[in-house]
């Protein structure tokens, strides 16, 4: 986990790589799950009643499909990791660089259907935070606890597709997980005292500790 905490920001990125199975001609990581906020959202907020949307120009002006709900002109960080992240494998006689090799972009939970969920799902939501109330003044959002619940629902759907829980767990244990969340807990919570009470209840240090503790518990649920 990479974490940065100071008086005004907390940015957390988690990459969990449990195991990689090399299969000739196939994706080196069979599935990829994404949790977070607007830095990773790829369309989950499109149909929500919220000001935190990006499904209109100039967002997406450099993306092949135009505006999709990504809060960027083109690909976001999750897209770049999925397509270009390289993994080093120590072979017997030489080092080899292997591309993750996902054939397409991971779908947002809001529109993921059928067997495509076996390749992964993006649960990220603009304005979402570690704390459930974060970003509420902007409208609806899928906070981290709800993203984790959505992942649980995805797993149940995967069990139906795969046939049993044991095989599903074996599949999940080879997947890549990324979480990028926490900045909204400051810019859309702690630093908005007219809307939220956290600024008056906690010192900056206390609030940072509170976020880290809650985040740690959420990661245990995810894993």
Residue ranges and their predicted role:
Residues 2-223:
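Conserved active-site regions of diverse hydrolases
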């Amino acid at each position: 986990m990479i974490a940065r905490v100071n008086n005004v920001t907390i940015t957390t990125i988690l990459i969990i790589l449990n195991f990689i199975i090399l299969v000739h001609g196939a994706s080196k990581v069979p599935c990829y799950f994404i949790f977070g906020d607007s830095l990773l959202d790829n369309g989950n907020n499109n149909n929500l009643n919220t000001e935190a949307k990006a499904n209109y120009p100039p967002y997406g002006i450099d993306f092949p499909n135009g505006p999709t709900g990504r809060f960027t002109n083109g690909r976001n960080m999750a897209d770049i990791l999925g397509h270009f992240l390289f993994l080093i494998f120590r072979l017997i006689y030489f080092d080899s660089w292997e591309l993750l090799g996902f054939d397409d972009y991971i779908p947002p939970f809001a529109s993921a259907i059928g067997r495509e969920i076996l390749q992964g799902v993006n649960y990220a939501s603009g304005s979402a935070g570690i704390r459930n109330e974060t970003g509420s003044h902007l409208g609806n959002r899928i906070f981290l606890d709800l993203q984790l619940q959505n992942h649980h629902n995805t797993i149940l759907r995967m069990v139906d597709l795969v046939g049993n829980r044991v095989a599903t767990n074996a599949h999940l244990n080879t997947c890549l997980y990324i979480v990028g969340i926490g900045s909204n807990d400051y810019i859309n919570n702690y630093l908005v005292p007219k809307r939220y009470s956290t600024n008056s209840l906690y010192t900056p240090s206390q609030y940072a500790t509170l976020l880290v503790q809650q985040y740690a518990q959420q990661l245990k649920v995810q894993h």
